Each structure stands twice: as C-alpha cells, then as structure tokens.
C-alpha cells in the first residue's frame, strides 16, 4: 500500500524558488531583479521556443514592452523565430496580452498562441492594408501519440476587422477532466468577445514539453 504522506528533507532549506508561471509587464528592473533574472530583461519563467536571433527582438524596459521584428517568412507559427513561451497550469490557465501592431506589414502576424503541434493562435495581421484579427489552428491528423506528419493545412476560423492597431487578446485553456481545450477572445466594446471556436489540444511527441502559451511575431 502506498504511503499517504512522504517527508523529505531539503538540501537547500533557505532557497527561494520563483514560480514557473507568472505575469510580466516587461518594465524596468531594479538591481535585485537584474541579479536574479539576468540582463536581457525577462523573468525566468520565459523560454525561447527556438534558438533566438537576438538582433530581431528588444525588451524596452522603459516603455514596458517587448518589440519583435518579422524578418523571416514562415509556414506557420511553429517556425516563428523568437517566440517566447511559458508553461500552462492545471486545471485552467488564462493569459492576456496587449499587441501594438502599428508597424505591421501585409502578411505579418503578431499575437498569442497555445503552442504545440496542433496549435491554436490569435493574431493581428494586415491584408491589402486592412488590419484584421484572426484565429487559426492546426488540427490533429491522426490519434497516434506521434506528431502530425505535415499533411494538414492551417485553418483560419474567423477574421474580424479592427480599427485600432492596439488590441487586447486573451487565451483561456481548460484542462479539467481531460477537456484539453483552448479559446481566444479579444476586448471590444467594453467586453470580451470570442474569436473562432474552442480548439482541441493534444499531447503528442512532436512537442513533448506539452502545451505552452507563446508570444510571437512572424511574416
């Protein structure tokens, strides 16, 4: 019979551990924060999804913003350079970000995603000079634990015209009772409005870190 309680003794009883999931306003740091987290300007909860190209990304601590450049054409968000990610938490996870897409060009995308092989995303883009908010996803090809084989195309579920280049985007993920679903919302007319459908998430070996929330920009 398994024990209900197991006592362990820490080898570092005075150590302070920072959370794996937390908010960040990317604002100016004091010397103690810089000592703890390094010099680039992020808390330790953030991780790059790929090997970064640091000349294409800037943390403007004075303005409290993260500035990304779209200098590489990508097939979809999984190829985006400099995507930064955090873990998601059980049983539910809610994340918000404000995207300022004033400098976006036709064909660029900037926003937030639930990053895995069968990803879901909401992003600001521009088409023929018109600013749009879109919700896109990549659906499961098969029920194997192996990842998609690249035979499916990304689906754009909804696109809405937006007047302002500054848009609040919200991600809500539900992991309770193996629901494993995510939806995206945007702030308009003093309320949150859903864009696109709930998207089904899957754990597969192509992204063995599970599902992470990501901030991205790509062309």
Feature names for model-found ranges:
Residues 1-219:
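Extracellular glycan-recognition regions
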């Amino acid at each position: 019979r398994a024990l209900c309680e197991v006592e362990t003794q820490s080898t570092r009883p005075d150590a302070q551990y920072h959370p794996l999931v937390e908010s960040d306003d990317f604002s100016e740091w004091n010397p103690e924060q810089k000592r703890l987290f390094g010099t680039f300007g992020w808390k330790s909860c953030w991780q790059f999804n790929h090997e970064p190209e640091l000349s294409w990304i800037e943390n403007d601590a004075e303005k409290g913003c993260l500035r990304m450049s779209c200098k590489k054409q990508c097939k979809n968000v999984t190829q985006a350079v400099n995507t930064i990610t955090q873990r998601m938490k059980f049983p539910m996870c809610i994340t918000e970000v404000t995207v300022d897409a004033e400098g976006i060009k036709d064909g660029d995308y900037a926003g937030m995603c639930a990053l895995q092989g069968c990803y879901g995303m909401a992003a600001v883009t521009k088409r023929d000079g018109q600013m749009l908010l879109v919700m896109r996803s990549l659906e499961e090809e098969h029920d194997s634990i192996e990842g998609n084989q690249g035979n499916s195309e990304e689906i754009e579920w909804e696109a809405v015209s937006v007047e302002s280049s500054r848009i609040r985007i919200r991600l809500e993920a539900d992991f309770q009772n193996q629901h494993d679903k995510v939806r995206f919302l945007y702030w308009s007319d003093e309320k949150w409005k859903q864009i696109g459908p709930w998207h089904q998430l899957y754990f597969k070996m192509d992204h063995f870190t599970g599902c992470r929330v990501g901030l991205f920009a790509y062309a």
